[in-house]
């Protein structure tokens, strides 16, 4: 139903734009009428043209590299996290790596699965 309301508006706007002269075609030029001939360029003009092409190419490659660097930076930011779970995992990893040093420096507290069911007289031996 909405299409039938839109169609007359579309046709009317097309006619208004056509009458205003917006849809006039550009004059057709054949390839033979082209004024640009690379054979008649001077050496200075060729150097300027080459420099302009190279400058555009370098700018294009620079913008592509910046976009890739931004994408890499975004993925690196996603990996680094400061939430409590991430910090806990980092601390657990550092504790597991330094576990042997902790066992050497501190005495055992007799807590855990090995201490379950032991009596106080067994612990005093």
UniProtKB/Swiss-Prot annotation:
The gene is CRSP2. InterPro entries: Calcitonin-like (IPR021117), Calcitonin/adrenomedullin (IPR021116), Calcitonin_gene-rel_peptide (IPR015476), Calcitonin_peptide-like (IPR001693). GO terms for biological process: adenylate cyclase-activating G protein-coupled receptor signaling pathway; regulation of cytosolic calcium ion concentration. It comes from the Eukaryota. This is Calcitonin receptor-stimulating peptide 2. Residues 26-77 form a propeptide. PANTHER family: CALCITONIN GENE-RELATED PEPTIDE 2, CALCITONIN-RELATED. Belongs to the calcitonin family. GO terms for cellular component: extracellular space. The keyword Secreted applies. Pfam families: Calc_CGRP_IAPP. Residues 1-25 form the signal peptide. It comes from Capra hircus (Goat). It is found in: Secreted. Keywords: Cleavage on pair of basic residues, Disulfide bond, Receptor, Secreted, Signal. Disulfide bonds join 81-86. One of its GO terms (molecular function) is calcitonin receptor binding.
